[in-house]
């Protein structure tokens, strides 16, 4: 009988994972590369074999603290090829997220239908977060690997399995220091609130600290190997450049002295209120878990207060204080949806049918909308997304421009060929890209100076060419052709694209 029962649970688990994958498919299917994916695969490639890649590459960093991500993505690129590695990594991460999500929801005793509805709501409403542009289900990045391990760890901690959870959290930290590190600390707080054996909690904390010490060493090392930043001529500090100029959507809600995340904050307050009702009326079986999720909501309020006082200096911007908002939103949804399902829907079969039909209609609708692009997609989509003129340009550059030659490309061209994928496609350095900003202080200063000088070149200020020491630039429209004509001569044209040799 136990054997039959175990087989039944295994089948139920597999079907729940399959259903979760189906729900996540519209956002995880590899329809098109994201800028982040291009950057992270390039970084992984560079770190695994740095010899061909110099500091002239736009995607180049001395950061070592995502070593696990670099190893996994770099090896996938090396043995599968870039496009195939990206294509299959999307599916691998989708399955990994599905397994982790199911494991976590089962540990929380969330019923299958409730877990599915909560995930649909999470993906469709609020863009997977309260605010700060965070997400879990989306692309191939180090933080997605980390979230898989964190969700598995949440499930283990709920079940009282501290040691394996500590190991998973340590590994998650090597994939993404901020994700793994924050949720490790948060889960130790949960163990304390839950009254777990204090001796085990202390040993678990010590074990985690020992396991991540090499990571701490890498963080110190990567900030010591570089010279101090050269901020001469800059109107902003390094922290202001990183937070206010490049990443305000993630870390600077009070930029220019007014609150930019009003809609998300109202959403946050609404679900905080729901969570309070669940706790007060004891509508969830694990009251300590509800208290813990509530405490994490209070943490976000403190983070907003800190961001207000830090709005001029941005000293803490690089720590991404709001990164937990995404997983916290998902955990809150699970608690609230479980309470609604067991204490409101349970009294009426009609309510259950209406809600079930509504949610699965939304899920099927999202899948149908995405299906045409999903069917047309293929593992070679990085090149196949280009038109004939763009492919001709890429081929000409690869054939006629020596390797190692820097070719500037403007930002935000609005075309399939852009500053995010150009460097990968031509296999030559492009010096700087707005999309990729490094994280060490020296490199941030260098990045911003290069951004400003490149902008001046595309405005026709030819004196900036010598400061950047570049010889080629690509124009993608007539305005840029007119400006670059002041500083150089056309070398090759393909449609609206004109490659210039700069004087």
Regions found by a protein language model. Give the residues of each.
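Membrane-interface transmembrane helices that cradle and orient dolichyl/undecaprenyl
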Residues: 145-164
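Transmembrane catalytic cores of multi-pass membrane glycosyltransferases
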Residues: 25-41, 45-66, 82, 177, ...
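Membrane-interface junctions at the ends of membrane-embedded or membrane-associated helices
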Residues: 1-10, 158-164, 191-203, 330-357
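Active-site lumenal/periplasmic loops and adjacent helix-entry segments of GT-C-fold
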Residues: 10-13, 23-98, 104-119, 128-146, ...
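Transmembrane helix irregularities
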Residues: 79, 157, 171-179, 213, ...
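Short periplasmic/luminal acceptor-recognition loop of GT-C membrane glycosyltransferases, typified by
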Residues: 387-391, 395-455, 459-480
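Signature aromatic-anchored transmembrane alpha helix within multi-pass, membrane-resident enzymes
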Residues: 209, 343-373
């Amino acid at each position: 009988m136990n054997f039959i029962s175990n087989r039944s649970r295994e089948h139920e688990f597999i079907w729940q994972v399959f259903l979760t994958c189906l729900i996540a498919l519209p956002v995880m299917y590899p329809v098109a590369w994201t800028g982040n994916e291009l950057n992270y695969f390039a970084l992984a490639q560079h770190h695994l074999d740095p010899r061909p890649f110099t500091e002239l590459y736009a995607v180049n960093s001395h950061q070592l603290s995502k070593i696990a991500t670099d190893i996994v993505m770099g090896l996938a690129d090396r043995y599968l090829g870039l496009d195939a590695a990206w294509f299959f990594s999307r599916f691998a991460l989708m399955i990994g997220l599905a397994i982790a999500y199911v494991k976590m929801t089962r540990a929380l005793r969330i019923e299958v239908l409730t877990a599915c509805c909560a995930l649909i709501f999470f993906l469709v409403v609020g863009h997977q977060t309260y605010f700060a542009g965070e997400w879990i289900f989306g692309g191939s990045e180090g933080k997605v690997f980390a979230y898989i391990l964190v969700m598995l760890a949440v499930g283990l901690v709920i079940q009282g399995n501290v040691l394996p959870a500590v190991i998973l959290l340590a590994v998650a930290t090597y994939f993404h220091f901020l994700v793994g590190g924050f949720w490790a600390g948060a889960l130790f707080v949960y163990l304390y609130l839950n009254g777990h054996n204090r001796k085990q909690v202390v040993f678990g904390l010590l074990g985690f600290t020992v396991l991540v010490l090499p990571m701490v060493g890498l963080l110190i090392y990567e900030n010591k190997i570089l010279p101090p930043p050269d901020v001469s001529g800059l109107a902003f500090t390094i922290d202001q450049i990183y937070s206010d100029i490049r990443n305000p959507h993630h870390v600077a809600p009070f930029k220019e002295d007014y609150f930019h995340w009003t809609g998300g904050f109202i959403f946050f307050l609404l679900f905080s209120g729901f969570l309070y009702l669940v706790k007060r009326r004891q509508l969830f079986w694990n009251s300590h878990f509800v208290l813990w999720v509530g405490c994490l909501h209070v943490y976000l309020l403190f983070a907003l207060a800190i961001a207000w006082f830090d709005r001029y200096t941005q000293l803490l911007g690089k720590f991404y204080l709001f990164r937990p908002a995404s997983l916290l939103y998902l955990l809150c949804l699970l608690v609230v949806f479980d309470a609604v399902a067991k204490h409101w829907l349970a009294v009426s079969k009609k309510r259950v049918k209406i809600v079930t039909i509504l949610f699965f209609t939304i899920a099927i609708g999202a899948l149908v909308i995405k299906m045409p692009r999903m069917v047309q997609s293929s593992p070679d989509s990085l090149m196949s997304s280009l038109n004939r003129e763009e492919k001709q340009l890429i081929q000409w550059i690869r054939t006629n421009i020596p390797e190692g030659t820097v070719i500037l490309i403007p930002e935000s061209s609005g075309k399939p060929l852009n500053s995010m994928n150009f460097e990968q496609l031509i296999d030559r350095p492009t010096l700087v890209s707005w999309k990729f900003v490094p994280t060490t202080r020296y490199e941030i200063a260098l990045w911003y100076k290069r951004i400003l000088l490149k902008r001046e070149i595309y405005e026709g200020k030819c004196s900036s060419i010598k400061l950047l020491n570049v010889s080629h630039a690509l124009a993608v429209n007539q305005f840029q052709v007119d400006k670059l004509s002041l500083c150089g001569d056309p070398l090759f044209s393909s449609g609206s694209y004109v490659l210039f040799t700069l004087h």
